[in-house]
Amino acid sequence: MSDLASLETSILDQIAAAGDEAALEAVRVAALGKKGSISALLATLGKMSPDERKTQGAAINLAKDKVTQALSARRDVLKAAALDARLAAETIDVTLPLQDTPADTGRIHPLSQVMDELTTIFADMGFSIAEGPDVETDDYNFTKLNFPEGHPAREMHDTFFFNPKEDGSRMLLRTHTSPVQVRTMLSQKPPIRVICPGRTYRIDSDATHTPQFHQVEGLVIDKGSHLGHLKWILHEFCKAFFEVDHINMKFRPSFFPFTEPSLEVDIQCRRDKGEIRFGEGEDWLEILGCGMVHPNVLRACGIDPDEYQGFAWGMGIDRIAMLKYGMSDLRQLFEGDVRWLSHYGFKPLEVPTLAGGLST
């Protein structure tokens, strides 16, 4: 009995001294495991006489129960201590400011924002979006758009040409998005109502010009389309884009090879200390070019000009973005300065809508 009491005391002391659950498990295995000390005593009961088995069995089982209870109690203590330590290590200081999420810190580039605004406005008028390749043929970029041979726009100082092919033909980086209009007229039957936003390229670089820039053009082809429709579309666009209730416009005669008649559009504005306010004042600002599609362009695209007529317009997305949001240097749009983008960019979840506001 004295040996059992000593063993029990030793095991209970080891349980109390266990500093973590791993050490406690080692004590349990040493005492109650298959080859444990108490398990070994229980195995000897079969060799005892009935009287000894009765006395020793009760004592050994009592010791086993005490060890089991002690193990359970110590395990609860160690689990609680481990949880307290983890909570202490992962303490959150509720007085610290919340960390910004990517949706809070990220910004939509002004050009992407303006493209979304443009597509929102024209989609509301029933226009669809047409796209085409940046690398174009001379035929689509010039010939089918009524640019005659020898036109200045074909010269190397305006256009990025690739090396000539074996047959002498040359590919180029499109100088406007008008080739998308050509592709649309060749692939679709009238009526047509599309806008063509995208990148364009010309050899030029200063504060108001870059070798790569963005344009959006619009095209309407139908049997009854006329300049009155064009004027209404552009008037409604300018009101919606510049977010004013009223705006005056002037249409001036101009020349573009692909339209006849050709017009340039000025809108009313007021210049005040470097800022431009639209819809008020006595100044005028050129905003875009437009006109009725030239009959030669319609014929080149397989459309009978005696049955259909249409109008088109085009504007620089970079320029109208600068005018609307007060940016002074076009080159900054392409420099990737995070500080600049943080100032001029837009929150990614504020999608422009006509109902909710384009630039809010």
Curated annotation (Swiss-Prot):
It is an enzyme of class 6 (ligase). Its main location: cytoplasm. GO terms for cellular component: cytoplasm. Disulfide bonds: none annotated. Its EC number is 6.1.1.20. One of its GO terms (biological process) is phenylalanyl-tRNA aminoacylation. PROSITE patterns: AA_TRNA_LIGASE_II. Binds 2 magnesium ions per tetramer. This is Phenylalanine--tRNA ligase alpha subunit. It comes from Bradyrhizobium sp. (strain ORS 278).
